[in-house]
């Protein structure tokens, strides 16, 4: 059987979602590890006055591509940016570009999707379902297409506790939903959304399940594979450890925890934190397309790209390692010292929200007003709480994913491909990964230099001293209030003070005796 780089040699690849986190890493890995690929057509829309070519050039200039620039300086020649709008009819392709794609494409990687959990249903259906269907229809016209690779999510069927590597029946017929959305106004769509999505937590999950069914039905005559990653996190190894460039998912929470803003979160300490590194998802996608292209299986291949069943990690452990990392290597200008309390108790959660989030933010905004600055902390806390609401479903529940196809795929790789396209998450050391992840948010998301660590540590020590001083004053005030009114409290106070004095006297005497 040919190796993965040999399979992609001379191939023309069509990639959607190249401006997204996963798409960027896939593009880099494909060009670096399969250097003899012929060309990569990247579907990109114009945005903010930038042409598709300018947007692609901006991506290629990022640190993510530093290693590729060193190993293959001419890689840009293989990338062809094509103006396309996935939400428009026929993907808004020009006739010339369409003809080139139809004649040349060998493998499609469909990574584009709206990942906003609070997206309204109409927009989520447009990008996640209708755009996928239009891409399938385009793929059916391609003369040399070998594989259609669709990236979904492991949570598409989160209404089930055990999820196999199959496409389940959809909650509603996608065609009927699309037809209905054409005549419904936005108000009606918003009203019926909760009933439609049912026991799924958001429109993203709901529409990704519909998209899988569309791929299965509309792409029945194509050679299709589906990869379902769980919570995609920073890179494990490639192109270097800890690469992350966004606030999505756990990244934003890690940063908020490191800044001392996030103090409590509704989560179960024992719930599985099914994080999967982005490079594992990319390697799985490239390997899955290779397997389908070489073996042409009779049925659609689905791969649950998860970690919980083979290398379990829990949210309580995530919290411990994140806080430990940011205490050793703090973020600059932290609001408070990092400390997070996870709880699944409703009343306790709201108590900590009031005491640890809203009260300090309110007092800090008063301080900002008094010093002539614009208050901002309550707005930050409000945004944080909205993000927490969307994520608490995933931090409070656990699922079991079957990974037989992933295990089969891993066994099909030759020894060299197992190293180059590593998908064996049993080798993943979680403590090291979380530390690299946290440092990645510091370096690549917040753009903080490691040379600033001494100052950041000094600032954290200052916050610690302020906290100890505040707590000491608070205890003294409380005791003084009780002492003034209660003889018993006064006796206890004098007893504690005398005990401390005796202890200090004994310690001083014993120290003197040693000399």
UniProtKB/Swiss-Prot annotation:
<dbReference type="GO" id="GO:0080019">
    <property type="term" value="F:alcohol-forming very long-chain fatty acyl-CoA reductase activity"/>
</dbReference>
<comment type="similarity">
    <text>Belongs to the fatty acyl-CoA reductase family.</text>
</comment>
<keyword id="KW-0576">Peroxisome</keyword>
<keyword id="KW-0472">Membrane</keyword>
<keyword id="KW-1133">Transmembrane helix</keyword>
<dbReference type="GO" id="GO:0005778">
    <property type="term" value="C:peroxisomal membrane"/>
</dbReference>
<dbReference type="Pfam" id="PF03015">
    <property type="entry name" value="Sterile"/>
</dbReference>
<keyword id="KW-0521">NADP</keyword>
<comment type="subunit">
    <text>Interacts with PEX19; PEX19 mediates the targeting of FAR1 to peroxisomes.</text>
</comment>
<dbReference type="GO" id="GO:0046474">
    <property type="term" value="P:glycerophospholipid biosynthetic process"/>
</dbReference>
<keyword id="KW-0444">Lipid biosynthesis</keyword>
<feature type="transmembrane region" description="Helical">
    <location>
        <begin position="466"/>
        <end position="483"/>
    </location>
</feature>
<dbReference type="InterPro" id="IPR033640">
    <property type="entry name" value="FAR_C"/>
</dbReference>
<dbReference type="InterPro" id="IPR026055">
    <property type="entry name" value="FAR"/>
</dbReference>
<dbReference type="GO" id="GO:0102965">
    <property type="term" value="F:alcohol-forming long-chain fatty acyl-CoA reductase activity"/>
</dbReference>
<protein>
    <recommendedName>
        <fullName>Fatty acyl-CoA reductase 1</fullName>
        <ecNumber>1.2.1.84</ecNumber>
    </recommendedName>
</protein>
<keyword id="KW-0443">Lipid metabolism</keyword>
<keyword id="KW-0812">Transmembrane</keyword>
<dbReference type="GO" id="GO:0005777">
    <property type="term" value="C:peroxisome"/>
</dbReference>
<feature type="topological domain" description="Cytoplasmic">
    <location>
        <begin position="1"/>
        <end position="465"/>
    </location>
</feature>
<dbReference type="InterPro" id="IPR013120">
    <property type="entry name" value="Far_NAD-bd"/>
</dbReference>
<keyword id="KW-0560">Oxidoreductase</keyword>
<comment type="function">
    <text>Catalyzes the reduction of saturated and unsaturated C16 or C18 fatty acyl-CoA to fatty alcohols. It plays an essential role in the production of ether lipids/plasmalogens which synthesis requires fatty alcohols. In parallel, it is also required for wax monoesters production since fatty alcohols also constitute a substrate for their synthesis.</text>
</comment>
<feature type="topological domain" description="Peroxisomal">
    <location>
        <begin position="484"/>
        <end position="515"/>
    </location>
</feature>
<dbReference type="GO" id="GO:0010025">
    <property type="term" value="P:wax biosynthetic process"/>
</dbReference>
<dbReference type="Pfam" id="PF07993">
    <property type="entry name" value="NAD_binding_4"/>
</dbReference>
<dbReference type="InterPro" id="IPR036291">
    <property type="entry name" value="NAD(P)-bd_dom_sf"/>
</dbReference>
<feature type="region of interest" description="Necessary and sufficient for PEX19-mediated localization into peroxisome membrane">
    <location>
        <begin position="451"/>
        <end position="507"/>
    </location>
</feature>
<dbReference type="GO" id="GO:0008611">
    <property type="term" value="P:ether lipid biosynthetic process"/>
</dbReference>
<dbReference type="GO" id="GO:0035336">
    <property type="term" value="P:long-chain fatty-acyl-CoA metabolic process"/>
</dbReference>
């Amino acid at each position: 059987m040919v190796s993965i780089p040999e399979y992609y040699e001379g191939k023309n690849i069509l990639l959607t979602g190249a401006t997204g986190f996963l798409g960027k890493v896939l593009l880099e890995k494909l060009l670096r590890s399969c250097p003899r690929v012929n060309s990569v057509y990247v579907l990109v829309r114009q945005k903010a006055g930038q042409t598709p070519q300018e947007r692609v050039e901006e991506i290629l200039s990022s640190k993510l591509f530093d290693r590729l620039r060193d190993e293959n300086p001419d890689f840009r020649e293989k990338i062809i940016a094509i103006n396309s709008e996935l939400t428009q009819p026929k993907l808004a392709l020009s006739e010339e570009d369409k003809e080139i794609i139809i004649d040349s494409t060998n493998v499609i990687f469909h990574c584009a999707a709206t990942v906003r959990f609070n997206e309204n249903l109409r927009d989520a259906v447009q990008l996640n379902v209708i755009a996928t269907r239009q891409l399938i229809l385009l793929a059916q016209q391609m003369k040399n297409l070998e594989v259609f690779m669709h990236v979904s999510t492991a949570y598409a069927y989160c209404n089930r506790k055990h999820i196999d590597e199959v496409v389940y029946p959809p909650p509603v017929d996608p065609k009927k939903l699309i037809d209905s959305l054409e005549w419904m106004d936005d108000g009606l769509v918003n009203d019926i959304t909760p009933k439609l999505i049912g026991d799924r937590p958001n429109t993203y999950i709901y529409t990704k399940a519909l998209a899988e069914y569309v791929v299965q039905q509309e792409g029945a005559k194509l050679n299709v594979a589906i990869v379902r990653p769980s919570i995609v996190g920073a890179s494990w190894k490639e192109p270097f450890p800890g690469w992350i460039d966004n606030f999505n998912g756990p990244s934003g929470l890690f940063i908020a925890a490191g800044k001392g803003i996030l103090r409590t979160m509704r989560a179960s300490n024992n719930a599985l934190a099914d994080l999967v590194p982005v490079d594992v998802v990319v390697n799985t996608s490239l390997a899955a397309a290779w397997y389908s292209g070489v073996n042409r299986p009779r049925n659609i291949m689905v791969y649950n790209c998860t970690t919980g069943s083979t290398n379990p990690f829990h949210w309580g452990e995530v919290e411990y390692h994140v806080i430990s990392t940011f205490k050793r290597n703090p973020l600059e200008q932290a609001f408070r010292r990092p400390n997070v309390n996870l709880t699944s108790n409703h009343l306790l959660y709201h108590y900590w929200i009031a005491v640890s989030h809203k009260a300090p933010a309110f007092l800090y905004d008063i301080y900002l007003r008094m010093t002539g600055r614009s208050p901002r902390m309550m707005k930050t806390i409000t945004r944080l709480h909205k993000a927490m609401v969307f994520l608490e479903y995933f931090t409070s529940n656990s699922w079991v994913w079957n990974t037989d196809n992933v295990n089969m795929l891993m066994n099909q790789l030759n020894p060299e491909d197992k190293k180059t396209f590593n998908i064996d998450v049993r080798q993943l050391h979680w403590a090291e990964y979380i530390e690299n992840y946290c440092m990645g948010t510091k370096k690549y998301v917040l753009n903080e230099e490691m040379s600033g660590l001494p100052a950041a540590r000094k600032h954290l020590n200052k916050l610690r001293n302020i906290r100890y001083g505040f707590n000491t004053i608070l205890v003294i005030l409380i005791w003084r209030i009780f002492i003034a009114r209660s003889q018993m409290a006064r006796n206890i106070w004098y007893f504690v003070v005398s005990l401390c004095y005796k202890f200090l006297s004994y310690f001083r005497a014993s120290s003197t005796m040693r000399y």
